[in-house]
Amino acid sequence: MPLYQDEGVVLRTAKLGEADRILTLLTRDHGKVRAVAKGVRRTKSRFGGRLEPFMRVALLIAEGRSLDVVSQAESIAAYAGPICADFQAYTAANVICETADKLVATEKEPAVAQYRLVLGALNALAKHAHEPSTIGDSYVLRALAIAGWTPRLRVCVVCGEPISSALSWYFSIPAGGLMCAADHTPESEAVSWDAICRLSALVDGDWGELDGVPASASIQRETHQIVEEWGEYYLERPIRSMRLLD
């Protein structure tokens, strides 16, 4: 079987037979790859714990007819340890990996920007750089933005009215962003000015803004609900892990 080298992050695993696992990987050069890790569930597996979710690994993979086969794996960054030791970080990491798995639908198609975003988010969680749920929310919005679904947060999506704290604003997920009071539709929801500012910072990855003035619990709930609904609408299925970030 032809061999290829790459590096990747383990998004999820599934048991196969008595000792094997099917890995879903997001790789730097080959995009999403599904591969079998033979014997990985045995106590004395040569892979050790290198092929667990959230691990970044250098890989040698053999191409197969239906599934590829992992021949070698070496750890690059052991994100799993510090992430799994913190429940909130673990939950956010599951959101990230579930979203990446659903968003990158086609296998063996390069998705470099998505790969780099996943690495940055997992690295931030492992280092406890920011509040875990905020990392998760920011990742979801930025990953969807890379895919072409960026919420419009600076003007009304109907008339182009620039946003202002002096006006009332509504958010419509089907319409793709903010609506002014004159043009908002029945399905749109009123959104607070603080939530608009937080959503903008989440999309931009503006950690100076996000860390500088901590949002109240109510604003965090308001923005998290929008992020969850935005992800579900554009992925056309729920991000189930997000419910644990509430």
Curated annotation (Swiss-Prot):
It comes from the Bacteria. Keywords: DNA damage, DNA recombination, DNA repair. SUPFAM superfamilies: ArfGap/RecO-like zinc finger (SSF57863), Nucleic acid-binding proteins (SSF50249). GO terms for biological process: DNA recombination; double-strand break repair. GO terms for cellular component: bacterial nucleoid. It holds the Pfam family RecO_C. Gene3D superfamilies: Nucleic acid-binding proteins, Recombination protein O, C-terminal domain. Coiled coil: none annotated. Belongs to the RecO family. Involved in DNA repair and RecF pathway recombination. This is DNA repair protein RecO. It comes from Bifidobacterium adolescentis (strain ATCC 15703 / DSM 20083 / NCTC 11814 / E194a). The gene is recO.
